[in-house]
């Protein structure tokens, strides 16, 4: 009985350790994966034809994002809202390609970049974007704007 308890405890430790790794380890490969997603997404998002842009964004998201995030994005687009889940509805463009930075901090990836934005009065300005990106099972699962 004691041996079974030890084996179960060891198995539980292995499972918990695996779950922690899949939540995001911050290793160079994962940081580069998040960076590559935002590079590709910025190019797709910048396409002027909405139909082509949405198709390319969906394609990139299908590779790098969780099934749930992809499902929410498609559902939102078909309802006509077109909320941008990958940037927490801030947006991304070619300027982001030049200023994109990704670092791992306290269990999440912090993505920063500059974005050509426009205010309600249609005046252009450069926005500093900071996103907190959560990973699960080697896929982007959540994105939340911070600050």
Model regions and ranges:
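Surface-exposed, charged secondary-structure patches
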Residues: 75-121
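Bacterial Sec-dependent N-terminal signal peptides
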Residues: 1-26
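Short beta-strand edge/turn micro-motifs at domain boundaries
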Residues: 122-147
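Short, well-ordered alpha-helical segments enriched in acidic and aromatic residues
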Residues: 47-76
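Generic alpha-helical hydrophobic packing signal
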Residues: 31-35, 113, 130-132, 145
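Short, aromatic-enriched amphipathic alpha-helices that serve as compact interaction elements
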Residues: 26-49
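Short consensus segments that form the blades of beta-propeller domains
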Residues: 51, 120-123
């Amino acid at each position: 009985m004691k041996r079974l308890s030890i084996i179960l405890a060891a198995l539980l430790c292995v499972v918990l350790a695996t779950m922690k790794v899949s939540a995001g380890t911050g290793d160079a490969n994962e940081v580069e994966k998040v960076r590559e997603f935002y590079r590709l997404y910025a190019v797709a998002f910048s396409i002027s034809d909405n139909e082509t842009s949405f198709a390319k964004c969906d394609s990139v998201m299908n590779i790098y994002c969780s099934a749930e995030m992809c499902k929410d994005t498609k559902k939102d687009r078909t309802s006509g809202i077109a909320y941008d889940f990958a940037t927490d509805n801030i947006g991304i463009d070619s300027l982001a390609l030049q200023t994109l930075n990704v670092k791992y901090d306290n269990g999440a990836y912090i993505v920063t970049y500059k974005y050509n934005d426009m205010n309600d009065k249609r005046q252009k300005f450069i926005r500093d974007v900071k996103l907190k990106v959560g990973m699960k099972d080697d896929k982007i699962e959540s994105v939340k704007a911070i600050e």
